[in-house]
């Protein structure tokens, strides 16, 4: 019998420690070896209990989750799942934590008697059970990739870029989008698996770092070149023709493969736009979201890029697309922006 995955639960709320422990122990693959009420307590228990995975609250007394995460990742990294509140501050903290090396996050259940609890439980179990397989990488010491800016923009009506990603996506998106020039002659539509309330913070953070404009997508807006639109958490992102323009459409249709927004839904919608060249990018993430949509995109004029196993945090979504032979190029995360730019110049 396989040994169980050992988990340390860190939260300043006794009630939340109990709820999370109960959720995790409902799965036979997981064993909660201990709990801690703050960061200092967590650092001590990490040494004595040797957990495989840690769930970590952010807002705690004595030592908060961000400081705890910094210490853990600099001394002896382990996979950490952030347990975040759904407030704007909680969203910002979760994004900061992922930049510092946390592998993923979930939002706290909203109450003890709630349908929300069951959803959170299934998500928490999935993320914790897969966390030991996630690659933990130190910050790259390699020389930055030299970026060659576009010399001659091409009209927008020729190209549209679509990106799908999940676990590890916020850091991957930062790597790609910060290397794109402000005069990029194509719009970018992005699905990042995230709950409602978090995608706006992600868009704002990326916008402050990028030459292109990055924003959360809004229903009915006309897409423009040089702008990246991130699907809001809880909504599918689709496109529709409006005369010679293309507008965004947000829907609350059922989740696909458990996801809303879904990469498949975006890719399938964009595949229906005739006479437009599509550049599709699938990056780090669990599961196979995006593969069905990519099959439809490839029936038309589409160049598909998959992130290589070498740079993926989780080599799931790209792996499936590669195995189905739907991909034209497999490349390291640091080179994806360069590939996108080359396709815009074709």
From Swiss-Prot:
<keyword id="KW-0378">Hydrolase</keyword>
<feature type="domain" description="CheB-type methylesterase">
    <location>
        <begin position="155"/>
        <end position="346"/>
    </location>
</feature>
<dbReference type="Pfam" id="PF01339">
    <property type="entry name" value="CheB_methylest"/>
</dbReference>
<keyword id="KW-0597">Phosphoprotein</keyword>
<feature type="active site">
    <location>
        <position position="289"/>
    </location>
</feature>
<feature type="domain" description="Response regulatory">
    <location>
        <begin position="6"/>
        <end position="123"/>
    </location>
</feature>
<dbReference type="GO" id="GO:0050568">
    <property type="term" value="F:protein-glutamine glutaminase activity"/>
</dbReference>
<keyword id="KW-0145">Chemotaxis</keyword>
<dbReference type="InterPro" id="IPR008248">
    <property type="entry name" value="CheB-like"/>
</dbReference>
<feature type="active site">
    <location>
        <position position="193"/>
    </location>
</feature>
<comment type="similarity">
    <text>Belongs to the CheB family.</text>
</comment>
<dbReference type="GO" id="GO:0005737">
    <property type="term" value="C:cytoplasm"/>
</dbReference>
<dbReference type="GO" id="GO:0008984">
    <property type="term" value="F:protein-glutamate methylesterase activity"/>
</dbReference>
<dbReference type="GO" id="GO:0000156">
    <property type="term" value="F:phosphorelay response regulator activity"/>
</dbReference>
<dbReference type="InterPro" id="IPR000673">
    <property type="entry name" value="Sig_transdc_resp-reg_Me-estase"/>
</dbReference>
<dbReference type="InterPro" id="IPR001789">
    <property type="entry name" value="Sig_transdc_resp-reg_receiver"/>
</dbReference>
<feature type="active site">
    <location>
        <position position="166"/>
    </location>
</feature>
<keyword id="KW-0963">Cytoplasm</keyword>
<comment type="function">
    <text>Involved in chemotaxis. Part of a chemotaxis signal transduction system that modulates chemotaxis in response to various stimuli. Catalyzes the demethylation of specific methylglutamate residues introduced into the chemoreceptors (methyl-accepting chemotaxis proteins or MCP) by CheR. Also mediates the irreversible deamidation of specific glutamine residues to glutamic acid.</text>
</comment>
<protein>
    <recommendedName>
        <fullName>Protein-glutamate methylesterase/protein-glutamine glutaminase</fullName>
        <ecNumber>3.1.1.61</ecNumber>
        <ecNumber>3.5.1.44</ecNumber>
    </recommendedName>
</protein>
<dbReference type="InterPro" id="IPR035909">
    <property type="entry name" value="CheB_C"/>
</dbReference>
<dbReference type="Pfam" id="PF00072">
    <property type="entry name" value="Response_reg"/>
</dbReference>
<feature type="modified residue" description="4-aspartylphosphate">
    <location>
        <position position="57"/>
    </location>
</feature>
<dbReference type="GO" id="GO:0006935">
    <property type="term" value="P:chemotaxis"/>
</dbReference>
<dbReference type="InterPro" id="IPR011006">
    <property type="entry name" value="CheY-like_superfamily"/>
</dbReference>
């Amino acid at each position: 019998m396989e040994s169980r995955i050992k988990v340390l639960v860190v939260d300043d709320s006794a009630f939340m420690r109990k709820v999370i422990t109960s959720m995790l122990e409902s799965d036979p693959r997981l064993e909660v070896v201990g709990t801690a009420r703050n960061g200092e307590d967590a650092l001590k228990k990490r040494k004595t209990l040797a957990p495989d995975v840690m769930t970590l609250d952010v807002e705690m007394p004595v030592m908060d989750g961000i400081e705890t995460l910094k210490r853990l990742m600099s001394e002896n990294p382990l996979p950490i799942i952030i347990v975040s509140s759904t407030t704007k501050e909680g969203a910002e903290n979760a994004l900061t934590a992922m930049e510092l090396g946390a592998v993923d996050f979930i939002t706290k259940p909203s109450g003890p008697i709630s349908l929300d609890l069951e959803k959170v439980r299934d998500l928490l179990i999935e993320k914790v059970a897969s966390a030991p397989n996630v690659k933990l990488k130190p910050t790259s010491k390699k020389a930055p990739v030299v970026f060659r800016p576009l010399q001659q923009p091409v009209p927008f009506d020729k190209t549209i870029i679509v990106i799908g990603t999940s676990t590890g996506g916020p850091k991957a998106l930062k790597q790609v989008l910060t290397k794109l020039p402000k005069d990029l002659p194509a719009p970018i539509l992005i699905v990042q698996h995230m709950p409602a309330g978090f995608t706006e913070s992600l868009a704002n953070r990326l916008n402050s770092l990028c030459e292109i404009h990055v924003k959360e997508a809004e229903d009915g807006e006309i897409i423009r070149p040089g702008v990246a639109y991130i699907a809001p958490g809880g909504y599918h992102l689709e496109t529709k023709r409006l005369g010679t323009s293309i507008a965004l459409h947000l829907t609350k249709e059922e989740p696909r493969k458990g996801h809303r927004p879904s990469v498949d839904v975006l890719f399938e919608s964009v595949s229906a736009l005739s006479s437009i060249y599509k550049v599709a990018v699938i990056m780090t993430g669990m599961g196979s979201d995006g593969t069905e949509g990519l099959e439809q995109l490839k029936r038309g004029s589409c160049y598909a890029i998959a992130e290589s196993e070498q740079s993926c945090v989780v080599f799931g979504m790209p792996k499936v697309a590669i195995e189905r032979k739907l991909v034209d190029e497999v490349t390291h995360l640091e080179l994806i922006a360069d590939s996108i730019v080359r396709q815009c110049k074709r």
